[in-house]
């Protein structure tokens, strides 16, 4: 089967975006066609010394439609180049939340301080549909090939 290089437009849904900082209007957008994550920026100066963390405001609040969730993911470039990542990745923004999206960043670089200025991209926001589970109490669970084997159960890469 050959790979189809045709770009298909992804599904879309409307998400209301409220700007909370008049100096930095809400600028949620996708950098490239096909990107899953929209850039989130900081609205304040942030300095993160090695192993320091901070809750960083983005100046953005959103209203998601029912059945959707927004996930705050790290930016791969920040992680690879500066050692900065989202502490609780991915962070969850539920559809009912209307407050400012804030990003808990941590600098995992042991030597270098990371500095961000208003307008710098600090994370990405991915919008996804989700399924709401009906949790059913059970005395026993059906068997599976994996059973109770957990951490490290698939072995170590050679």
UniProtKB/Swiss-Prot annotation:
Pathway: Pyrimidine metabolism; dUMP biosynthesis; dUMP from dCTP (dUTP route): step 2/2
Name of the gene this protein is made from: dut
Function: This enzyme is involved in nucleotide metabolism: it produces dUMP, the immediate precursor of thymidine nucleotides and it decreases the intracellular concentration of dUTP so that uracil cannot be incorporated into DNA.
Family matches, as PANTHER family: DEOXYURIDINE 5'-TRIPHOSPHATE NUCLEOTIDOHYDROLASE
GO molecular function, one term: magnesium ion binding
Species: Bifidobacterium longum (strain NCC 2705)
Cofactors (names): Mg(2+)
Cited Gene3D superfamilies: 2.70.40.10
Cross-referenced InterPro entries: dUTPase, dUTPase-like, dUTPase-like_sf, dUTPase_trimeric
Binding sites annotated in the UniProt record for substrate: 75-77, 88, 92-94, 102
Family: Belongs to the dUTPase family.
Residue ranges the record marks as coiled coil: none
Uppermost EC category: hydrolase
Protein name: Deoxyuridine 5'-triphosphate nucleotidohydrolase
Single GO biological process annotation from the record: dUMP biosynthetic process
Keywords: Hydrolase, Magnesium, Metal-binding, Nucleotide metabolism
Catalysed conversion reaction: dUTP + H2O = dUMP + diphosphate + H(+)
């Amino acid at each position: 089967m050959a790979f189809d290089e045709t770009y298909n437009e992804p599904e879309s849904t409307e998400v209301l975006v409220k700007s909370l900082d008049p100096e930095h209007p809400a600028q949620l957008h996708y950098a490239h066609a096909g990107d899953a994550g929209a850039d989130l920026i900081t609205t304040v100066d942030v300095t993160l010394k090695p192993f320091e963390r901070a809750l960083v405001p983005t100046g953005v609040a959103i209203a998601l439609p029912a059945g959707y969730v927004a996930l705050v993911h790290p930016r791969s470039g920040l992680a690879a180049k500066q050692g900065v990542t989202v502490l609780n990745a991915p962070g969850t923004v539920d559809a009912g939340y209307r407050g400012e999206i804030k990003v808990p960043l941590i600098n995992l670089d042991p030597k270098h301080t990371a500095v961000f200025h208003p307008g710098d991209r600090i994370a990405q926001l991915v919008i996804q549909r989700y399924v709401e589970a009906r949790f059913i109490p059970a005395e026993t669970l059906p068997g599976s090939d994996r059973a109770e084997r957990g951490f490290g159960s698939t072995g170590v890469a050679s």
